[in-house]
Amino acid sequence: DSPGGASDTQKQHXVNSXXXKXY
């Protein structure tokens, strides 16, 4: 995950699990 805020990290994790981006 890209460094940022805790909320941003959680959001990206969710998106990563669901859609599998490239984070």
UniProtKB/Swiss-Prot annotation:
Signal peptide start-end: none
Disulfide bond residue pairs: none
Listed GO biological process terms: oxygen transport
Chief place where the protein resides: secreted
Taxonomy, superkingdom: Eukaryota
Tissue-by-tissue expression: Hemolymph.
Molecular-function annotations in GO: oxygen carrier activity
Keywords, in A-Z order: Copper, Oxygen transport, Secreted, Transport
Region of interest: Disordered: 1-23
Keyword hit for Secreted: yes
A GO term from the CC aspect: extracellular region
Cell compartment(s), UniProt: Secreted, Extracellular space
Family: Belongs to the tyrosinase family. Hemocyanin subfamily.
Function as written in the Swiss-Prot or TrEMBL entry: Hemocyanins are copper-containing oxygen carriers occurring freely dissolved in the hemolymph of many mollusks and arthropods.
Name this protein carries in UniProt: Hemocyanin subunit 1
